[in-house]
Amino acid sequence: MVQRLVYRSRHSYATKSNQHRIVKTPGGKLTYQTTKKRASGPKCPVTGKRIQGIPHLRPTEYKRSRLSRNRRTVNRAYGGVLSGSAVRERIIRAFLVEEQKIVKKVLKLQKAKEKVAPK
C-alpha cells in the first residue's frame, strides 16, 4: 500500500508559490519538501537584458547580510542596475547633448560678433 502524503503547511492549493517535491526521510517515510522558486536574476530596466556578473537569486537573498557588496554590484556607473550597453548609450547621449550646448553657445557668440562688426 502506498503511503498517503499530507502538505506540511495549511496552504493546500497547487500554486507556483506552493510547489513541493516528495522526499524519503532517513526513517523511510515519504514527506513533502517545499521547493523554492527559481531565480531569474536582475534585468536591465532599459534593454530588458540580464545584468552580467550578478548571481541569480531571489529578491530577499540580495539583502546586506546574505550577500556582500562586491557580489551585489558591478564596478561601474549604474553597476548592478543597468546593463553595460545601456550605460554606454547614456554616456554617449550625455556627451552629445553637452556638445550641442557648446555648439549653440559658439553660434550665438558668432551671431553677436556679426551684429557688432557692421556698425
Swiss-Prot record:
Gene Ontology biological process terms, A to Z: translation
Ranges where the record places region Disordered: 30-51
Key words, A-Z: Ribonucleoprotein, Ribosomal protein
GO function terms (MF aspect): mRNA binding; structural constituent of ribosome
Pfam families: Ribosomal_L34e
Extent of the signal sequence: none
GO cellular component, one term: mitochondrion
InterPro entries according to UniProt: Ribosomal_eL34, Ribosomal_eL34_C_sf, Ribosomal_eL34_CS
Keyword match Phosphoprotein: no
Membership in a protein family: Belongs to the eukaryotic ribosomal protein eL34 family.
Name of the molecule in the record: Large ribosomal subunit protein eL34y
Natural source organism: Arabidopsis thaliana
Lineage: Eukaryota, Viridiplantae, Streptophyta, Embryophyta, Tracheophyta
Gene symbol of the encoding locus: RPL34B
